[in-house]
Each structure stands twice: as structure tokens, then as C-alpha cells.
Amino acid sequence: GEDEYAEGIREYQLIHGKI
């Protein structure tokens, strides 16, 4: 999206249970 970095973090948190 417009902020791929933020989306990447979002994906990571969803997958890894919010670090």
C-alpha cells in the first residue's frame, strides 16, 4: 500500500502474535 513498511509490520504482528 502507500506505506509498505507499516503494512509489513502489521503482517508480522498478526503472524507472530504482536512482538
Swiss-Prot record:
Keyword Calcium appears in the UniProt entry: yes
Main localization (coarse): secreted
Residues binding a divalent metal cation: E7, E11
GO terms of molecular function: ion channel regulator activity; metal ion binding; toxin activity
Record flagged with keyword Transport: no
Cofactor section: Ca(2+); Mg(2+)
Residues where 4-carboxyglutamate is found: E4, E7, E11
Tissue distribution of the protein: Expressed by the venom duct.
Cell compartment(s), UniProt: Secreted
Cofactor note as given: Adopts alpha-helical conformations in the presence of divalent cations and is unstructured in the absence of divalent cations.
GO CC terms, sorted: extracellular region; host cell postsynaptic membrane
Keyword annotations: Calcium, Gamma-carboxyglutamic acid, Ion channel impairing toxin, Ionotropic glutamate receptor inhibitor, Magnesium, Metal-binding, Neurotoxin, Postsynaptic neurotoxin, Secreted, Toxin
Remaining remarks: The mature peptide does not contain cysteine residue.
Task performed by this protein: Conantokins inhibit N-methyl-D-aspartate (NMDA) receptors. This toxin has highest potency for the NR2B/GRIN2B subunit. It induces sleep in 10-day-old mice when injected intracranially, and hyperactivity in 24-day-old mice.
Family the UniProt entry places it in: Belongs to the conotoxin B superfamily.
Name this polypeptide is given: Conantokin-Pr1
